[in-house]
Design a protein with these regions (language model features):
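Active-site metal-binding motif and surrounding structural segment of the metallo-beta-lactamase
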Residues: 68-111, 193-196
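Glycine-rich, phosphate-binding/catalytic loops in enzymes
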Residues: 78-80, 104-106, 177-179, 214-217
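N-terminal non-globular leader segments, chiefly Sec-dependent signal peptides
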Residues: 4-12, 195-198
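Histidine-centered catalytic micro-motifs
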Residues: 87-97, 140-148, 199-202
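Glycine-rich nucleotide phosphate-binding loop and flanking beta-alpha elements
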Residues: 68, 95, 116, 204-205
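Divalent-metal (often Zn2+) His-rich catalytic cores of metallo-beta-lactamase-fold enzymes
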Residues: 181-239
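Active-site flanking residues adjacent to catalytic metal/cofactor-binding acidic residues
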Residues: 62, 90, 110-111, 161-164, ...
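Catalytic core of the metallo-beta-lactamase
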Residues: 10-75, 79-84, 119-185
Length: 239
């Protein structure tokens, strides 16, 4: 696996566009810590970050992507570590769940909306806590404009994996945030002990939580009175 990536990005960056050369590479392994690695995202086909948390007995995999070589990559690390795989799916979009049918897993956790697409595994309706010697995990529901029924994964109270939960929704030709949901997200992040959050398709993958909160607060400040939706345009999207 690749060398440790930097954790101290000062500002949140925009989603990489299709011309970014990093997205034209094959997905590869990168390390965050000695227990936390991930497979990089791709654009063609669109494939999300695949995170792997190594516990005492299992490899906890958050999202499985859509790129065709990811199941083989996960099978190889499972074999090397001698540990079975447990999967958490952030939400139902294909770039996050398409490979689930090609992966051998012990358990599969997802929101109710995601289950409508997979028809397998367990629906998470309340927090799931995993308490091991070196790894402490919490799987919990995260409100989202982008995808109803999203799940987040908190790792050792330091890293919170959010998938696409903080991104806007697309309603017809409009890109929008639900103002009420956005406020809930900001409040959840502020109460969370973790100093870092991880958003799919972003670079760097690990972001300072406070930078992300500031980004969301700029969007929330654009809301109009008595309007449930915040319209995003090319002119008002904050950096």
């Amino acid at each position: 696996m690749a060398a440790d990536m930097r954790e101290n990005s000062a500002e949140i960056t925009k989603i990489q566009d299709v011309d970014n050369s990093n997205n034209k590479q094959f997905p590869t392994w990168k390390c965050v810590t000695d227990y936390f690695s991930y497979i990089t995202p791709a654009i063609k086909p669109l494939s999300a970050n695949v995170s792997v948390i190594e516990g005492e007995k299992y490899l906890w995999v958050y999202d499985v992507g859509s790129y065709e070589n990811i199941p083989e990559m996960l099978a190889e690390i499972s074999k090397q570590k001698g540990k079975k795989i447990k999967i958490i799916l952030s939400h139902f979009h294909p770039d996050h769940i398409a490979n689930v049918q090609h992966i051998k897993w012990e358990s599969l956790y997802q929101g109710k909306n995601t289950y409508k697409y997979t028809h397998i595994g367990e629906i998470v309706e309340s927090d799931i806590n995993v308490d091991e010697t070196d790894i402490k995990l919490r799987i919990f529901q995260m409100p989202s404009s982008h995808a109803k029924g999203s799940l987040a994964l908190l790792v050792n109270n330091k890293y919170c994996l959010l998938g696409d939960a903080l991104y806007p929704a697309h309603k017809g030709d409009k890109t929008v945030y639900n103002a009420g949901i956005l406020k809930q997200q900001i409040d959840i992040l502020k109460k969370m002990a973790a100093p870092y959050v991880l958003l799919s398709h972003r670079e760097p993958f690990v972001q300072k939580k406070q930078a992300v909160i500031s980004w969301l607060e700029k969007i929330y400040a654009m809301r109009e009175k008595n309007e449930p939706w915040i319209l995003m345009t090319g002119q008002n999207v904050p950096n």
